[in-house]
Amino acid sequence: MEIRLEQEKDYREVENLTREAFWNVYRPGCVEHYVLNQYRNNADFIPELSLVMIEEGKIIGHVMYSKASLTLDDGTEFPAWTFGPISIHPDYKRKGYGLKLLNYSIAKAREMGIGMLCMEGNIDFYKHAGFVVASTLGLHYHGEPKDAEVPYFLAQELTPGYLDGIEGTYHTPRGYFVADEHPDDFEAYDATFPERVKAVLDGQLF
């Protein structure tokens, strides 16, 4: 197993992997592959943390990171970071690859001086990589009451003391909504991939 930086020659393979990993998981079909495709030209994209996982000679996993921010109570912006999509090919899920890729990428982020991470996810999985419910760190999720414990809004301090005295609200970076903002462009892009059936399944969020 090898983890390395994503290269331009990997782009299409990684986008197809992302599509396979997320298809019908959170909604009928998925948009994560388009988010990734568009994010590479986004100023918030962190190319040093766009990583692929190789097993048996093929790409089976990928993760990307983005700059983000917290809005403090006085209205100022405080640097934050997030990650995702993180994708593991369906044939390799539930075998520990996702956690290995995540932990590797977090270690790289820490080495780069990234102070903290915010994200939306399942605490039952992400606690194994050091995440906690963000409200315990004084962080709030946009659109929710400040005193609400939002169980899917998670955070982790990477630099000790980075969040000391900090209380703020996290807004998901706009780049993650590109498919909603440009639905026709998204549909045209998705049509370049093999046709798949969109299904409404239990547990989907959208």
Feature annotation, model-predicted:
Residues 15, 22-70:
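Active-site rim helix/loop that mediates acceptor-substrate recognition in acyltransferases
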Residues 111-114, 121-148:
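Conserved active-site alpha-helix within GNAT-family acetyltransferase domains
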Residues 160-206:
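Acidic/histidine-enriched, glycine/proline-rich intrinsically disordered or flexible terminal extensions
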Residues 48, 149-153:
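Short hydrophobic/aromatic beta-strand or adjacent loop that forms the aromatic wall/cage
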Residues 91-92, 96-104, 114:
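Conserved acetyl-CoA pyrophosphate-binding loop and the N-cap/start of the following alpha-helix
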